[in-house]
Amino acid sequence: MNVRIIKGDDGHDKIQVRLDLGVLQLEFNGRPDGERVGDHESWLEHYQARQREHDQAHPDGPPLMLESEDCLKLLREGVQYYHRYLSFWNLQRYELCARDTARNLKLFAFVREYARHDREKLQFDQWRPYVTMMHTRAVATPLAELRDFPAAIGAIDAGIESIRQFLIDYDQLHRAEECGELQQLIHWREETVARQTGVPKIGTSVKSVESLRAELDIAISEERFEDAARLRDEIRRISGGIAPGQM
């Protein structure tokens, strides 16, 4: 991902992302495109305020439901935050990546509760494991770098539990081994415990392949193709020349 920080015409820092079809420029704070929705920072805050007002006016009535056009606005806005938190991750601005991933997780929870149609709930919530993994990485990475391993492991455990809860919510816990985001956090936890104790993991070679495959899935989803190629080569080396079943 080709991303850098530049000074904008207003003197404030901006994120500049170079894409195949051009350059994307994002604000550091507020909505990434710099726009506002009336008196609110974002469509999410706008609909949250409307929901509170509705609840106060109709305390015993049904909640105000999000219609399809509302969800579309929230989805497009959520994609902006996705581009920004990936940019912050690549810039190693972990605290800002954690801020934006937490924001999108709140978005998913809001849509899950108030969207009228199940198809729109799933359209958002399908990304919960990925964003949870990214949030966990953003929180735990600087802690591990500071060698605060208990705090890092606690953050990883919280991420693992959140993804497991997602699988429980959809009656898919029996497929936990197929969830790349969950497996990556589990293996990262093992590696972090090994760093803390100085004791290598048992069965390192087998688990390394599983961990690398999970990383490969993430690299492809983030369009980090050079990293993906490197990971494929490493998997082939460890597996004795057998290529993984990805593209």
Predicted regions: what they are:
Residues 1-111, 157:
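N-terminal alpha-helical interaction modules that lie
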Residues 3-9, 14-27, 34-35, 39, ...:
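N-terminal cationic and glycine-rich segments that engage phosphates or anionic surfaces
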Residues 63-78, 120-132, 196-208:
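TPR-adjacent "capping" and linker segments in tetratricopeptide-repeat scaffold/adaptor proteins
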Residues 66, 113-129, 168-181, 247:
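Acidic, Ser/Thr-rich low-complexity linear motifs
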Residues 74, 81-82, 100, 129, ...:
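TPR repeat positional signature
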Residues 84-88, 92, 133, 138-143, ...:
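Conserved small-residue packing positions in alpha-helical repeats and bundles
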Residues 97, 104, 111, 118, ...:
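Alpha-helical solenoid scaffolds that mediate protein-protein interactions
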